[in-house]
Amino acid sequence: DDQYHGQNGPLNVAQLRHDNPFTRYFVEAGSKHHKTNNDFNGSDQEGVGVYQVTQKNGKRCSAAVAYLNPAKQRKNLTIMTDTVVDKINFKNLTAVSVKCTTKNKVNELHAKKEILLCGGAYGSPTILQRSGIGNESFLQSHNIECLLDLKGVGENLQDHIDYITSHRVDSWELFAKPFKSLKFTMRAPFELIKFVLASKGMWTSNLAEGGAFIKSDENLEVPDLQLHFTVGMVEDHGRTEMWGNGFSCHVCLLRPKSVGTVKIASTNPDDDPLIDPNYLSDDEDMEVMIKGYRKMMEIMNTEPLAQFNNVRNPINIDDDKAIESAIRARSDTIYHPVGTCKM
């Protein structure tokens, strides 16, 4: 839908260049239970379909590719890597400089106009806390002078929790870890040649090719669940070594009611922050996730996907307690933290 898609911007959005049959199977199975959506970035997100990708000519088009790389040679831009920001220095509550460390050398960078803090949902609140902005009693517990008592800093952490089901399938069409699958190891070099010469083939895949936005309750105005169908087996963010080929499907809670916190562990910026996402602390989140698991498996158990339904972690679909136990044991972040810098 051209009304919802720009045409000339630097960050390119494109259709996938590789047509994986298993992604088609997912969409076909899902469309027997939900409507088909050919453009998730159009006027309506609900339905089952194939995701668009931020690619150009089959290669990743990230924010760095689109915006940073073209600007790197500007005389008024200095990029500092291997740098840790400690805190922002203030004068009468006006940000005037930034204290940081680059390769063990401490620097203070003074602002001529303004300072923009873009450290993300974990970095920004911890920098503010070390700078003296946050909950006064918490700052005092670390012997930090409170410049501004803002109780929302480091609070209200919300994140999308995600559960994955993996299915082992012996197929040439699916991804696997290098040398963990004979089929993929044999096919990968030929696909690499295709990618280098024509920017086509498996290596143009984003892996999470298909998906859906669905409702746990049809009375809802908008979807509260998202599915990602991945043309490879995934466990523990890819850290778990698995032999063979397969596919996975994620179910993600889009509107969690559970909230957590992020706080500094000390005044040392090299110390990892204390992150408590507090997942599933609200009972309604678990209720929706259980419904979401069932809706996901309803698609997995529908042809043409059902013929490949060799689940690595099977659960009794009729047992709420078993589903809840699996969700508590195996769910994890899908990297969408927000909400920790309430001003």
Predicted regions and their residues:
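Conserved redox-cofactor binding core of oxidoreductases
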Residues: 1-95, 164-188
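FAD-dependent oxidoreductase catalytic-site/capping-region signature
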Residues: 1-42, 49-51, 190-343
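Stable alpha-helical elements in mature extracytoplasmic
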Residues: 22, 26, 63-67, 123, ...
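Alpha-helix boundary recognition
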Residues: 31, 69-73, 129, 140, ...
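Structural detector for helix-capping/boundary residues
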Residues: 66, 83, 113-114, 341
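A short acidic-Thr-Gly-centered motif at the start of a beta-strand
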Residues: 69-73, 108, 343
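Glycine-rich loop(s) and the adjacent beta-strand/alpha-helix scaffold that form part
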Residues: 88-202, 267
